[in-house]
Curated annotation (Swiss-Prot):
May form homomeric filament after self-association or heteromeric filament after association with alpha-tectorin. It is found in: Cell membrane; Secreted, Extracellular space, Extracellular matrix. A lipid is attached at residue 304 (GPI-anchor amidated glycine). Disulfide bonds join 204-264. Glycans are attached at residues 80, 104, 116, 145. It comes from Gallus gallus. Residues 19-287 form the ZP domain. This is Beta-tectorin.
Length: 329
């Protein structure tokens, strides 16, 4: 009985309570996460209660949060009402997502000034991932606050035990000399992004240095396709993971270097606006053979000269990605 009485008193207090104190601060805080967008405005803007404000004019999902009204777009993919009227467009190489918080009172007369808090989140589509990877595990996921977001922190390169790409090899990844020519399975994966975004590998190459622009390099993937027939691209642009395999190799005539660094230009593709899967014409892929030994062209941009090195240690094709370095003994 006491509990019921207290509950009724709370209801009556709310019923007779006056409107909130108007706040005329034109401020909006925007947090652009890889999958979610959160916005905050000062509570009681120009006298409006939180239940009178709608995200995109659709979602009345505002909550009180320490002096602010907070609104959330839980997923950047338009499904049901979770998208909350968010609009998007692609202006190469940036994705733009924009929406607004608007007043939407259904009463006969309105005494508060209408409000419209517009906001935008932008995300780059292209990333060059080239960190040393064999001594580093999956990249730590973090986000950047503000009006500009990034997908880069969600990208990582993993090594797998076989072509099923189900079992990840632990770092550090070491290739023994006796394993030169053996299959290596790799995948660039994006975690925590909306399902609408697919991972596309544009170009992948290997260098004997951590510098992605090092003059000695070997191409693995060019314009989304395998550089030769010994490299197999399993998936590219179909899911949140792009996978491929190649034969382990080492660079010749490179003294005092035992590491191979991998680099990939990675594109995050919006499958709701574009066709993301990469289609390759195998007739355009060429492989040179001399006496059954593969010949690889390595550009050595030294004084404008270009030289060729012969890799006689078995199939010499590697080059993968996004900053993981294989230690070859």
């Amino acid at each position: 009985m006491v509990a019921v009485t207290v509950y009724l008193m709370v209801i009556l207090a709310q019923a007779f309570a006056g409107p909130c104190t108007p706040n005329k601060a034109d401020v909006i805080l925007v947090y652009c996460y890889p999958r979610t967008i959160i916005t905050k405005i000062p509570e009681c803007p120009y006298g409006w209660e939180v239940n009178q404000l709608a995200l995109g004019g659709i979602c009345y999902n505002g909550i009180h949060d320490s002096g602010y009204y907070q609104f959330t777009i839980p997923d950047l993919s338009p499904k049901n009402k979770s998208y909350c009227g968010t609009q998007s467009e692609f202006k190469n190489p940036v994705y733009h997502f924009y929406n607004s918080i608007v007043s939407n009172d259904s009463t006969v007369i309105v005494k508060s000034q209408p409000v419209n808090y517009s906001f935008t989140c932008t995300y780059n589509a292209n990333y060059l991932v080239n960190q040393a990877a064999f001594d580093q595990r999956v990249a730590t996921i973090h986000v950047k606050n503000g009006s500009s977001g990034s997908f880069e922190s969600q990208l990582s390169l993993n090594f797998y035990s076989n072509a099923k790409f189900s079992s990840i090899k632990e770092a550090p990844f070491v290739v023994e000399t006796s394993e030169i020519g053996s299959d290596i399975f790799a995948g660039v994966e994006a975690k925590g992004l909306s399902d609408r975004f697919k991972v596309v590998l544009n170009n992948c190459w290997a260098t004997p240095s951590s510098e992605y622009f090092y003059q000695v390099h070997w191409p693995l993937i060019t314009k989304g396709c395998a550089s030769d027939f010994s490299i197999v691209v399993h998936e590219n642009g179909k899911t949140n993971r792009a996978t491929f395999q190649f034969n382990a190799f080492r660079f010749q005539n490179i003294p005092k270097l035992s590491k191979v660094w991998l680099h990939c230009e990675t594109h995050v593709c919006d499958s709701e606006k574009f066709s993301c899967p990469v289609t390759c014409d195998k007739r355009k892929q060429r492989m040179e053979q001399t006496g059954g030994v593969l010949v690889a062209e390595i550009s050595v941009r030294n004084k404008g000269l270009s030289r060729f090195y012969m890799l006689s240690d078995v199939i010499f094709h590697l080059l993968f990605a996004i900053g993981f370095c294989a230690i070859l003994l």
